[in-house]
C-alpha cells in the first residue's frame, strides 16, 4: 500500500485504507504511522475476545456489563489478538462496526465505541427477480447435486432437499453444532420421505499454508 501510494499516486489523490477484523489491524497501524496521508478505517464484525467468550460457553451479552476485555483476554489466552484489535480501534482515523449490539460489545471490551455503525446486510435488489432467479436457482441446484452424486456415488434426484451452512470455523458461535444435531435428528426421522443433501461450507484448515 505504501509503495503503491508513493509511486503511483499524487498528493491530490484521496486514498482510504479499509481494514476488517483484528488480522488486518497491524496493516492499518503501519499505514497510519508511515503514510498518514492515507485515511484509515478499521471495521470489526465482532470483537475477538467476544467471540472467545461465547465460544467458551460463557454468557456474552447477559453479563457484558461485567466483563473487562483485558482481563478476559488474559484468562482466555487471547492477549495478542485482543491487543492488536484494541490498539487499532483506538488509533485509526475511523473505527466502525456492523450493528448496535456489536457496538455495545466494543464499548465494554475494547473501551471504545465505534465512530460510525455501518449496518450489516444486503440491498433489496441483491437477489435476482423473476425468471432470472428461477434460472440461477435451477443451475445452482443441478451443479450441487452433480458434485454430491459424483463424490458420494449416489443418484439423488431433483426432489432432494438441499440445505447448508457457512462461515468461519466457530463450532458453537456459528451454530455448526446445532446444524449437525439437526441433521442427526433428521437422519433418525422415520417419516422423512426424501433425500436431504447438506453442505457445510466452512474452511477446514486455517492454521498455516498447506504444503
Give a label for each model feature.
Residues 1-211:
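Catalytic cores of nucleotide-sugar-dependent glycosyltransferases that transfer UDP/GDP/TDP-activated
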Amino acid at each position: 500500500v505504501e509503495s503503491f501510494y508513493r509511486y503511483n499516486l499524487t498528493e491530490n489523490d484521496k486514498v482510504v485504507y479499509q481494514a476488517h477484523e483484528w488480522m488486518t489491524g497491524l496493516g492499518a497501524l503501519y499505514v497510519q504511522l508511515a503514510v498518514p496521508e492515507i485515511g484509515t478505517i478499521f471495521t470489526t464484525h465482532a470483537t475477538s475476545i467476544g467471540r472467545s467468550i461465547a465460544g467458551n460457553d460463557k454468557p456474552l451479552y447477559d453479563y457484558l456489563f461485567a466483563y473487562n476485555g483485558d482481563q478476559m483476554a488474559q484468562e482466555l489466552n487471547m492477549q495478542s489478538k485482543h491487543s492488536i484489535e484494541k490498539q487499532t480501534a483506538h488509533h485509526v482515523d475511523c473505527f466502525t462496526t456492523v450493528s448496535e449490539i456489536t457496538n455495545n460489545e466494543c464499548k465494554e471490551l475494547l473501551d471504545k465505541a465505534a465512530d460510525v455503525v455501518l449496518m450489516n446486510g444486503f440491498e433489496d435488489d441483491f437477489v435476482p427477480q423473476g425468471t432470472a432467479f428461477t434460472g440461477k436457482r435451477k443451475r445452482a441446484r443441478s451443479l450441487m447435486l452433480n458434485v454430491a452424486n459424483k463424490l458420494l456415488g449416489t443418484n439423488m434426484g431433483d426432489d432432494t432437499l438441499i440445505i447448508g451452512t457457512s462461515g468461519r470455523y466457530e463450532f458453537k458461535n456459528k451454530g455448526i453444532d446445532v446444524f449437525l444435531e439437526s441433521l442427526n435428528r433428521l437422519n433418525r426421522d422415520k417419516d422423512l420421505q426424501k433425500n436431504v443433501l447438506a453442505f457445510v461450507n466452512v474452511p477446514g484448515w486455517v492454521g498455516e499454508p498447506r504444503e
